[in-house]
Structure formats: C-alpha cells, structure tokens
Amino acid sequence: MRCVTSFVVLCILMFLVVNNVKVDVKAQRRKPVCKLTGVLNPGKCPTAIHDASNLCSRKLASPNMTFKRCDCQNTEWRGKDHYQCTCYIKLPCNQ
C-alpha cells in the first residue's frame, strides 16, 4: 500500500513540475511588443523590403519615436490597392 501511495504522490509531483516548467518557457518566448499601425494609404508597397521599411518609417515618423522595424502590407479595399504600415517601437514604449 505504501508503494502505491508513493507512486501516486510521485506522479502528482512530476505533473506539477512539468506543468510549471512549460508555463515558464511560454512566458519567456513571448516578449512585449510595442507596435504602431498606420492607416490605409492608396498604392502598393515597394517590392524591396528595405524600401518598404523606409517608406513606412517616413509615413509614421515623429520626432520622439525611433522604430526598430517597420513592415508594409498590401491590402485591397473597395476594389483598389492600398498598403498599411506597422512599425515596432524600441522598448520602453512610453518614451
């Protein structure tokens, strides 16, 4: 009887340890992102990634923000081509 009880307690402890480690790993993978999304602009994104990033940086530029990265996404709205910029701000976000 003691052997069965010890086995059950060991299984419960192992479950708790494995579950706790799994939660900690997920928390480390998720990093806070501060992103700023612009409005739809008529036209298309440039084909070169560097040109698209520069275009979006200029569109969303402000004197008190520096962007770590900008992405340009082509969309279609009301049958016409548009693009939308998303820029990621360097941490901390409130500066």
UniProtKB/Swiss-Prot annotation:
Disulfide bonds: C34-C93, C45-C72, C56-C85, C70-C87
Keywords of the record: Antimicrobial, Disulfide bond, Fungicide, Plant defense, Secreted, Signal
Keyword Ribosomal protein: no
Compartments reported by the entry: Secreted
Main location: secreted
Transmembrane segments: none
Any Gene Ontology CC annotation: extracellular region
GO annotation, biological process: defense response to fungus; killing of cells of another organism; signal transduction
InterPro entries xrefs: SCRL
Residues making up the signal peptide according to the UniProt record: 1-27
Family: Belongs to the DEFL family.
PANTHER family tied to this protein: DEFENSIN-LIKE PROTEIN 241-RELATED, DEFENSIN-LIKE PROTEIN 245-RELATED
Name of the protein in question: Putative defensin-like protein 252
Organism for this UniProt entry: Arabidopsis thaliana (Mouse-ear cress)
